[in-house]
Amino acid sequence: MLAGSNPKSATLVKRKDGSYYIQICVEKKPPKQQDTDKVIGVDLGRTDIAHTSEGDNWNGQQLSRVRDHYSRLRGVLQRKASKGTRSSRRRCRELLQRLSGKERRFQVWVNHRISKAIVSRAKTTNSAIALEDLTGIRKRVNQQPRSKAERRRANSWAFYQLRQFLEYKARVAGVSLILVPPAYTSQTCHRCLHIHPEQGKSYRSGKKFKCGHCGWEGDADLNGANVIALLGAVVNQPRGSGLFCSLAEQSRLRATESPLRTA
């Protein structure tokens, strides 16, 4: 990282657990972004943290188990911290601080691994990266029917941090990163570009996607990643504008036909 760069400053930082690390600020000119007509779509979600149009995915089950473990420990320590002797309460508060640091570092480590793998694949295949604009992703996933535990898991995951890691790693690697609007990405069939004709209904059911128009059937997150890749092609390929027109027309038809069906 320091090779070929110009260090500007260094800061010694003390963690809550008493350990230290050093932050070094360097100045490095990023390489020119590679010209390409290939796009890798990345779908971020609650079941798979990330799923790409290349078929790579990072399942969230193991990560959910780790976060649930931290949550249970936190609950036990919080209960103990509210009663007992003064020294035991202080000890519990110290353990809670250490636990918080471990969970935060775990999330950072996972997001670094995911972002590094995605950018490396894009660099190797001379592709750009497309992902949804994450503004409001936490609100959107929480609108879906889930248990209290599932909502807590989504709220605890650093989606925005993952996007930041992807952005800076892509910039350093000379890989273009494209943000696309999230509307209908999970409901559109990547093969025929159709969405369910009835408002409020979708061809997606959990992890499965079955198109009622062309018959394509497969993993819903893979389908979403492919749609995101197609939307990302708007920037790099002339055919992209046609995709937007297709989705816009279907959206308009659903909006105009809905009152007739309910009349």
Regions found by a protein language model. Give the residues of each.
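Positively charged, helix-rich recognition surfaces that bind polyanionic ligands
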Residues: 2-6, 14-263
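A basic, amphipathic helix-loop patch mediating RNA/tRNA/ribosome contacts
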Residues: 10
